[in-house]
Amino acid sequence: MDSLGTPQARQDLLISLNNVGRVVEVRGDWNTAEQIYDEAFGTFRDLADSLGTPESLRDLVVSLGNLAGVVEQLGDTERAESLRAERDRIAKILDSGSSET
């Protein structure tokens, strides 16, 4: 996804990808939803690391929550808990007004 140009263009595409993941999730195709959310999560993380903006961190928090929910449905409780812990850590940073990750 690095070849998509601007960070904003990548972010917009990732939000669309998350929306597709949500549709697949609602249909009960947990494995495909996990693949979609996992791909989006990796790139959201890259964007948050490079931009460090509150918006990029919020997107990462949403992505972590989406992935954690699907992973839990697939039975990997340990990974889901780890993803939620990371989500909560980043959310706390956002709540404190800091953009450090």
Task: Label each residue range with its predicted role.
Residues 1-10, 45-57, 93-99:
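Flexible helix-coil transition and linker loops at the boundaries of alpha-helical arrays
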Residues 8-26, 55-72:
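Conserved alpha-helical positions within TPR/SEL1-like repeat arrays
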